[in-house]
Amino acid sequence: MIYSYTAKKRIRKSFGKLGDVLPIPNLIELQVLSYNKFLGKNSKGVIDFSNSGLDEVFKSVFPIYDYANNCKLEYTGFKLGREEYTEEECRITGKSYSVPLKVDLKLSINIDSKSSGQLEIFENKEVFLGDMPIMTKFGTFIINGTERVVVSQLHRSPGVFFDHDRGKTHSSGKLLFSARVIPYRGSWLDFEFDQKDIVFARIDRRRKIASTIILRALGYDTKQILDLFYENNTVTIEKGNFFINQKLDDLKGSIAAFDIKHKSKVIVPKGKRITIRHIESAKTSKMKSFQIPNEFLWGKRICNDVIDQSTGEVILSCNQQITQELVETILESNLKKFEILHTNELDRGPFICNTLDVDPTTDQETALIEIYRMMRPGEPPTKDAASQLFMNLFQSSDRYDLSAVGRMKFNTRVGRTETEGEGTLANEDIIEVLKTLINIRNGFDTVDDIDHLGNRRVKCVGEMVENVFRIGLVRVEKAVKERMSTMELAEKLQPKDIVNSKPITATLKEFFGTSQLSQFMDQNNPLAEITHKRRISSLGPGGLSRERAGFEVRDVHPTHYGRICPIETPEG
């Protein structure tokens, strides 16, 4: 903290028995640093606009094109002017303590696109975009003459979270597991089990659809989907008997329903649990495959289509369940071998196979149309509209962003080593989430604790104002597009003619004046002031509401210890 000359000279007496060990930290640093980062000031007070939150917002919206691509409005930089009134004058006269925000814009107009393609460029013009409230050195804002504090918000960190319903959904008390991908901005994607062990998906908490519809929409067919989640075993047929080339490692922990033999030596007797000793014995005997009774195949799934070479008809189809009749059909045909999926009731549940059974779609196009119907009920679906909608949901950087924190959390949770990546969801990301969810259901992984502070993050002033500013700027973008399309191109257009700053000013005014998190400062005493600035709230836009917050949220979690005051826990 910087002390004035008189404060340095002031004699401070201490009547304590022990001397000070540590200097008092700057207790309101969190607020000041956050807002300075948004405006482009670093910790040393050096101003660098090109590395600020404001600059990022401008770059995410600009350049703006008109509908015919004849006009282009580019952003080249911004600067903040000097404040018109001092803090004291603002308090007395009831003004807001702010500085003018000026943006450098370059307008390019393509006059004659047909023949010469001639470009006419207006030089960079400075456009006034309204007043930007600035923070006093005490971490407060002066809005209409009153001091206000923007309280930091504690919300769920972007990333992927795995949870279960604690047995409340179904009367049997069965745990139904679910996964939720939460982006920084964009649509939420949920995967969940129902009581029949079928995996469903939801987008933005709408009605549920089979999770394989999402995989089909990404371009996978039935065979590829099964290959992603299951291993295959080859079954050979010799003299009317079935032999399987399965490693005993895969069956470890299960009880042998029949004698597992190699040549004539019994490796695992019937009714015994398969242990490491049996696995070692099989390895020393160099057992590659063993005979299985016909009943062992009942309920198993076929891995890929098997076609009769002579007639060309499909004997076995992909994901078909083997029944007693099908075993007899296989023995009657001239099949030498076929492949089955490795599933069991212990740790390799056939959840994706069951989901494919209830999936009404067969290819990518029908899957996209099914998703379109779920998102836009009542509208007639077309192939292009459905494809565009799905692309915009998770793979468009304009509509979807995990953020750097979200990507790091996501990668760590699904077991990747790299912590950086795209802000959008790739095919592999969605598959990794499903695989992790199935691993949790199979007992190889555990669910997350939602109230753990590691799964939450603090949104400070700078970030909140940045989001509000982005909303205002997107409204400006729409107005600019309309204006560009209706104006005559021959007119001498200037950037200031087509940019209207009112939407930005209005959103900022609304946030600082009426937002739940922008509060009138508690000025009863200096301590009340400091605790108000350091307070953390779970309420506010994008957070909880008082009515919906349950007991778990209000509880003191072990991770609060030494981090958050238990008396002022988020809204008690």
Which role fits each region the language model picked out?
Residues 123, 535-566:
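Flexible, glycine/threonine-enriched loop-and-boundary segments that flank and lead into catalytic domains
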Residues 1-533, 570:
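N-terminal non-catalytic structural scaffold regions of very large proteins
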